């Protein structure tokens, strides 16, 4: 078994299916390219190794574990493995009563995995390790890191009443912001960083990327979770995210199949309807899913949507349709990964079928995982009874459980299911990751219109500035960074805050403030899912903003719904920040005052005001206050060093091998191998560098540059490319071929 970065990557003599053959061909092409690069004397860019790995194919020992585990399961245990249940992400002591239901699911129901919600990275690790210790079969851990990356779940915690942020994972702008950037490099790093931080926190599988084409401006549930309204853009950026997540060591899930973008009902509260036939699906909704499957996406999540033009007026939702899951997805698109239902707690399913029957029908249709049934025992009992009644067979259940066990084995969970807290400290919310997130937010800011030429604003302009802010009362983080930054730039700015509780007196006071202003900044934090109507903006607010826009220099900033301006037709200067979190607030503020260039483009239309691709450019006109951003995402990720050329080994610190999970004794054996080679005259000298997880753990020199030269080798000795290519090309090629079972 070959090992890359301390992790096994394959088995000998593995069977060669069509997908595996394609992987091998790509590997051969990679090897050929590497040989060409080394021969030409140009080293390939150095990649930052992921702290966790996945094997490509199963070694014999892992395959044996899968089959023996399957054979040992009773019918009830087999069905239990199909269930993955939502759990709170916050810290709870294993001795607390709050831990008891979680423990019962794992110990008594023997569920296959858990999906933690909002918490902190250390709380994740503590809770997941405690549950893994109680599980007879290792748990597969999934999480919704779909919209904002790790920060969607392992950040966003604040201490009340002070609202002090508790820190956590890297928070990216929403997925649609990456559509506004349009650069695959950013989508790739979005996936890679999300995966690295997920794995460090104990999460194995991302419920991401969202592959829905958001071509309906009235969609209340997908919106900024999507890359955009262009299926080719969604496909391209989704594929880049998948590639990045693979490098980061996590599994990916494309969702929501066969598409949830062209809907106007939230499936959490009702059943959306997509009026598309097969030809329309092929030309729009299915394009990103087909590309993702070609890219090797590991899992697909279903959509709770009705498709009357495909399944008939009385047809079941896609989640419960064998025609969609087994016919369209498995047969037509040749998907052979794990198939998840969307959460079965959602009313689009439960209102009509109930938990038990919905679980049975989902498995009948072809689903491998029953996600978040809420009543775990009811779901398991219903599927067990359906099997005893002949609606399902044990073989059918084993096929699904085998897929899940293979995932766990590829992750090495049958050998070690636990995560070290040290992994959290090493990578979660690291400076490089935060810089990348800030850079993405900056690049995504989109200036949709600016008829009056108000953007960028001058901070020192001698006029009274009024900041009119609207957000839900429960959104305590709304405008925290924006308001603080605005006061830092315009100390005399006056803020007027409104929310859904504001009465006529509050609006009258706000109108007085606007009337006295020399210019008005309007920031609105309203997600599309708040409710129905014109972006859920109350009529008094719409009237106030439209009046301000006709009487005063007014700039509108949207921190959630990009479609907001449809309800405010009199606004001519409109900035879209895409997200409400602080990373987007800082970026919008910098754009507003010209501290950074504005280059974003709409990945969606805003009918009838703007089309896909619209967006005005603005140059940077003043020095940035926040300098954490970088111009190149590869620099932010540490993949490319722009600091200048350095002699290798110079200013390099050597870490303790134990800090990256390596053995000092093992390194000593490597030294002895080199010393033996020199004794046998296999070489006159050698330089050795060993690293793992971005840390150098050994840097040594042996012997002399030429026999009898008297010139010792040093760690900074410069070698000709012929000497380097022999080692790098041959060793890398051998490791790849061993990993693919060809050598």
Give a label for each model feature.
Residues 74, 124-139, 143, 149-153, ...:
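Second-shell residues forming the walls of enzyme active-site clefts
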Residues 28-39:
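Bacterial N-terminal signal peptides
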């Amino acid at each position: 078994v070959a090992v890359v970065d301390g992790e096994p990557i394959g088995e000998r003599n593995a069977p060669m299916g069509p997908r595996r053959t394609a992987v091998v061909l790509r590997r051969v092409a990679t090897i050929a390219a590497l040989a060409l690069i080394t021969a030409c004397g140009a080293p390939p860019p150095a990649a930052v190794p992921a702290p966790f790995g996945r094997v490509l194919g199963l070694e014999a020992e892992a395959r044996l574990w899968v089959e023996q585990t399957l054979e040992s399961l009773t019918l009830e245990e087999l069905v239990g493995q199909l269930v993955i249940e939502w759990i709170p992400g916050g810290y709870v002591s294993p001795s607390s009563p709050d831990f008891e239901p979680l423990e019962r699911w794992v110990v008594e129901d023997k569920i296959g995995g858990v999906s933690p919600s909002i918490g902190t990275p250390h709380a994740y690790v503590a809770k997941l390790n405690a549950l893994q210790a109680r599980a007879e079969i290792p748990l597969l851990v999934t999480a919704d890191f779909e919209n904002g990356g790790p920060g969607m779940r392992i950040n966003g915690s604040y201490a009340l009443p002070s609202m002090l942020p508790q820190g956590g994972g890297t928070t990216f702008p929403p997925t649609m912001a990456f559509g506004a950037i349009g650069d695959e490099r950013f989508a790739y790093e979005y996936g890679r960083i999300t995966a690295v931080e997920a794995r460090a926190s104990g999460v194995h599988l991302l419920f991401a990327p969202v592959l829905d084409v958001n071509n309906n401006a009235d969609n209340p549930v997908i919106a900024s979770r999507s890359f955009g309204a262009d299926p080719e853009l969604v496909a391209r950026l989704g594929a880049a995210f998948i590639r990045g997540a693979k490098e980061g060591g996590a599994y990916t899930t494309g969702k929501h199949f066969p598409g949830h973008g062209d809907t106007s009902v939230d499936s959490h509260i009702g059943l959306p309807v997509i009026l598309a036939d097969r030809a329309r699906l092929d030309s729009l909704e299915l394009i990103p899913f087909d590309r993702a499957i070609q890219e090797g996406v590991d899992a697909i999540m279903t959509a709770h949507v009705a498709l009357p033009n495909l399944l008939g007026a009385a047809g079941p939702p896609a989640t419960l349709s064998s025609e969609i899951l087994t016919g369209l997805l498995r047969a037509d698109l040749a998907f052979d990964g794990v198939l998840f239902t969307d959460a079965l707690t959602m009313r689009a399913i439960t209102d009509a079928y109930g938990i038990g029957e919905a679980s049975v029908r989902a498995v009948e249709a072809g689903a491998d995982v029953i996600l978040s049934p809420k009543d775990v025992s009811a779901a398991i009992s219903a599927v067990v009874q359906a099997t005893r009644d002949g609606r399902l067979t044990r073989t059918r259940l084993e096929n699904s459980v085998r897929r899940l066990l293979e995932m766990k084995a590829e992750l090495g969970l049958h050998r070690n299911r636990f995560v070290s807290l040290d992994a959290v400290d090493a990578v979660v919310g690291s400076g490089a990751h935060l810089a990348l997130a800030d850079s993405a937010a900056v690049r995504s800011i989109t200036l949709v219109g600016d008829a009056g030429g108000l953007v960028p604003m001058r901070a020192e302009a001698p006029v009274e500035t009024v900041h009119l802010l609207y957000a839900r009362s429960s959104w305590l983080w709304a405008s925290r960074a924006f308001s603080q930054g605005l006061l830092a730039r315009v100390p005399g700015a006056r803020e007027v805050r409104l929310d859904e509780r504001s009465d006529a007196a509050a609006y009258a006071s706000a109108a007085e403030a606007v009337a006295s202003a020399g210019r008005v900044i309007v920031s609105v934090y309203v997600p599309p899912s708040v409710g129905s109507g014109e972006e859920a903006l109350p009529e008094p607010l719409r009237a106030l903003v439209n009046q301000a826009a006709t009487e005063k220099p007014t700039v509108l900033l949207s921190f959630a719904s990009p479609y907001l301006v449809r309800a405010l037709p009199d606004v001519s200067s409109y900035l879209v920040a895409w997200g409400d979190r602080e990373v987007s607030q800082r970026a919008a503020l910098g754009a507003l005052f010209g501290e950074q260039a504005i280059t974003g483009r709409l990945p969606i239309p805003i009918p009838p005001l703007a089309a896909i691709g619209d967006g005005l450019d603005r140059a940077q006109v003043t020095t940035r206050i926040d300098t954490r951003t970088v111009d190149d995402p590869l620099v932010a990720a540490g993949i490319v060093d722009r600091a200048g050329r350095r002699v290798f080994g110079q200013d390099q610190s050597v870490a303790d091998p134990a800090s990256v999970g390596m053995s000092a004794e093992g390194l000593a054996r490597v030294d002895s191998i080199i010393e033996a080679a020199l004794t046998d005259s296999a070489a006159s000298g050698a330089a050795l560098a060993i690293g793992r997880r971005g840390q150098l753990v050994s840097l040594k020199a042996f012997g002399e540059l030429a026999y009898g030269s008297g010139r010792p080798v040093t760690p900074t000795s410069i070698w000709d490319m012929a000497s380097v290519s022999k080692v790098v090309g041959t060793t890398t090629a051998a490791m790849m071929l061993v990993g693919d079972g060809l050598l």
